[in-house]
Amino acid sequence: MESKRVDVLVGLMLIMAIFGVHSVTAHLPPGICIDHCMKECKLSGIGVVACIKYCPVHCLPPDSSSKEHFCNLGCMLDKCAKFNDDEKKMSDCVFDCRKFHCKINTD
């Protein structure tokens, strides 16, 4: 099972490289990176569901132990996947996940 996930991820990365989705986006702040990645991914002809799975993993900082990381990823997969045919609604949903739903206090 784990091998299949690795194969899928490697396949997505290869498709992204072939169609010009640049790894430079990983150096942007996560919110901007995800928005940019989603646009580039969809323009490349890759399915929106695959983009939703790829972009948060590609763009979020390496510290995946944070609650915010898992909240953003879960929120996007749970709430935003249904907007796969509407880029505006998808972008708004991703923004809402980051700014409102997953705003975790560290106090």
Curated annotation (Swiss-Prot):
InterPro entries: THNL (IPR038975). Residues 1-23 form the signal peptide. Stamen. Keywords: Signal. This is Protein TAP1. The lineage of its organism: Eukaryota, Viridiplantae, Streptophyta, Embryophyta, Tracheophyta.
